[in-house]
């Protein structure tokens, strides 16, 4: 649709060389637009917003292999450049089957000239079963989702991506066995406005411009926080207490500096359209450094 065409044009204007998209949300006209502008398209296969029984799909050899065949066939049918796996609800008992799925999928993607990437949380003990080290052996890129340190359902207000969280996610992924040249770190183009009222914590995710507008409209003073490497602000509005750790040029630059020092393969972001235009000059400088 027209929104997707705008995304394609914006991606090219900003120098984006790869876009990850759900096939259900991108029509053939959009794919043609991407191809004509020289932008690689990786189809994302995700369990987010879907009630998928991953164990039922991945735990039976015949079902898993049929799933692999279907994924690769779809990618080839739409003339895509790669497949991105974004499974965020893998249970510990499903871990071995998940890793085996990636092994089998990688054989077919490589045989058909497709790039295979896998999204991962920043490592914690509770996600060790994702098998990052094994992933690093078989896939082309391991993507660390370097955000959602404090996510939408959190009952504690905090940064979406403090610098220690970002660097820790990168370094623990490398320590798990993923080579830096295979690691892509994803940065947030969004922030959260946290509201505490009556002892209840809630939040709203906003893009950079919308967050800055909220700060200006409410007269919130922003102060650089050396701990998170972000500007922080707070305000009492009505009967509620608001807090924000904002993403902008300086916070993004700090994240890119950490990525450069760890020699990772590149940068991804969630999501295109949430960023300020000025962010791209910082990303260009990182890419060309």
Language-model-detected regions and their locations in the chain:
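Hydrophobic faces of well-ordered beta-strands that scaffold small-molecule active sites
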Residues: 1, 19-21, 39-45, 83-85, ...
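Alpha-helical scaffolding within the catalytic cores
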Residues: 1-7, 25-32, 66-71, 123-134, ...
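Catalytic domains of carbohydrate-active enzymes, especially glycoside hydrolases
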Residues: 3-26, 71-83, 254-268
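Aromatic-lined substrate-binding rim segments of carbohydrate-active enzymes
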Residues: 6-11, 21-46, 90-117, 277
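Substrate-binding cleft of extracellular glycoside hydrolase catalytic domains
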Residues: 29-90
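Substrate-binding surface in catalytic domains of secreted glycosidases
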Residues: 69, 91-215
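Glycan-binding loop/region signatures in secreted carbohydrate-active enzymes
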Residues: 189-257, 287-289
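Acidic/aromatic/glycine-rich contiguous surface patches that form carbohydrate-binding/processing clefts
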Residues: 255-289
């Amino acid at each position: 649709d027209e929104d997707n065409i705008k995304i394609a044009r914006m991606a090219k204007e900003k120098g984006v060389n790869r876009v990850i998209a759900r096939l259900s949300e991108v029509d053939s006209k959009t794919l043609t637009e991407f191809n004509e502008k020289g932008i690689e398209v990786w189809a994302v296969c995700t369990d987010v917003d879907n009630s998928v029984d991953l164990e039922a799909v991945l735990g039976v050899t015949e079902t898993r292999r049929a799933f692999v065949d279907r994924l690769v066939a779809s990618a080839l049918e739409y003339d895509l450049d790669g497949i991105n796996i974004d499974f965020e609800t893998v249970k510990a008992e499903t871990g071995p089957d998940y890793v085996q799925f990636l092994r089998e999928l990688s054989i077919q993607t490589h045989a058909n000239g497709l790039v295979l990437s896998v999204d991962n949380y920043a490592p914690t003990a509770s996600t060790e079963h994702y098998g990052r080290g094994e992933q690093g052996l078989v896939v082309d890129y391991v993507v660390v989702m370097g955000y959602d340190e404090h996510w939408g359902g959190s009952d504690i207000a905090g940064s979406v991506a403090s610098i220690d969280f970002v660097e820790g996610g990168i370094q623990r992924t490398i320590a798990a066995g993923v080579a830096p040249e295979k690691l892509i770190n994803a940065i947030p183009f969004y922030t959260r406005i946290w509201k505490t009222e009556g002892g209840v914590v809630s939040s709203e995710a906003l893009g950079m411009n919308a967050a800055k507008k909220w700060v200006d409209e409410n007269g919130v003073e922003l102060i650089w926080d050396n701990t998170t490497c972000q500007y922080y602000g707070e305000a009492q509005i009505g009967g509620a207490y608001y807090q924000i750790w904002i993403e902008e040029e300086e916070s993004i630059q700090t994240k890119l500096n950490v990525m450069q020092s760890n020699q990772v393969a590149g940068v991804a972001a969630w999501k295109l359209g949430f960023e300020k235009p000025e962010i791209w000059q910082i990303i260009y400088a990182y890419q060309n450094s």
